[in-house]
Amino acid sequence: MTQGANNGHLNGLALPHVRILPLSYDSEDSQQSATRLILTVRPDWASDDSNIEFIRFTDGITNTLLKAINKRKGWSKEDIDREAILLRAYGNGTAVLIDREREAQNHELLMKYGLAPELLARFQNGMIYRFIKGSVTSPEDLRKPAIYRAVASRLAQWHATVPCITHPTSANSHVDENGANGDQDPDAIIENAAPGKPVPNLWTVMQKWILALPINTQVQRERQEKLQRELEYIVKEFSQRPGLGADGLVFAHCDLLSGNVIVLPSSLPAKGSKKEATVTFIDYEYATPSPAAFDIANHFAEWGGFDCDYNVLPTKSQRREFIEEYVRSYFRCSQGNTGVDIEAETRKLNDEVDLFRGVPGFYWGIWALIQAVISEIDFDYASYAETRLSEYWAWKEEKEGDRAAAGKEMPLRERRWEQME
């Protein structure tokens, strides 16, 4: 697939860093600790006419997200929203899953390209950034043509214009050595997950997570060994495939669920209107150099929400429309569409997304197995892990022909993927 001219890699990117506050958020003392953080960033909010309130968002299943508003006397709702700030505190133990230094670097890079809100400060267990006025989408919204075309266009802009940040030692951060085998160095295992690819990347992230899986029981050890074998299979099948971006990797969001898609004000078209919506993306903690086809397949999986409702996943025609919009936007951003066969590029990317459709289930299945151990959030991660991993097994059975050979019925998710309309 043709590579985007503007999409390359940046080694050791130098960006102006935001200040780091020597404070933390305490969930047991939410109001006071959050207020202290906000006043450090906005000392003017301590004025007599200020009235600070916090609104808790409950859509996420990893972090605590608070919207801080100041109902200052004389301010309109417009004024209040314009000055609003978001405070995001990291979930318990999530450093094993997420490189927080890299997350901040992602945010700063996206700011440089006008694709992220201003990052105001970091603190010991989170960050503070400006609120983006708009409407958070629901899984149902993602299935609306005006929205999914807007998502396709914005995602293509990310992939075509934002360079990947790569570092020779970036995979080394905060590795829990639960899964290290014998005398092997876990850092070396991670960095060599996909030989020849700059690190970090989708493959090194999954390798890091597999090494972090609990291995306290025989069942856990056997599961880790099984998942390790599957990762090696996936890497062999996918890591060297040609694709968009330098080395077949783009700056990918990797977590484009409905809660991370914001429809900007006054951009949602009325029913019957041909006007297109405009969206932006938030939360960049999982953003990692990855194949574009993975990022798209991962987003398609989110049409079903956390409930994994396979009945509403995009049909062939919906995927085709999304991918064609993506391709047009990608090459418009990277090459001005000069000499590009849009139809041919759409077919190629559509085929790649089809191939990648099982990988998001593997990715989030491993993630959920770790969350089941470390998270304090009220969510059934263990069941979610089994659901997502079953998506991968179903895809592999279909790919290898095992399901048909055994005379088994095609699973619902695979049937939906085959559905035309």
Task: Put a short name on every predicted segment.
Residues 293-338, 358-376:
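Active-site activation/catalytic loop segments of kinase-like enzymes and analogous catalytic loops
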Residues 1-21, 171-195, 269-270, 337-342, ...:
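Intrinsically disordered, low-complexity cytosolic loops and termini enriched
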Residues 248-254, 258, 264:
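Catalytic-loop of the protein kinase fold
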Residues 1-56, 220-227:
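Juxta-kinase regulatory segment immediately upstream of eukaryotic protein kinase catalytic domains
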Residues 55-233, 237-250, 269-277:
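ATP-binding pocket architecture of kinase catalytic cores
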Residues 338-347, 360-421:
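ATP/Mg2+ or Mg2+-diphosphate-binding catalytic cores
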Residues 259-306:
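Catalytic activation segment of kinase domains across protein kinase-like and atypical kinase folds
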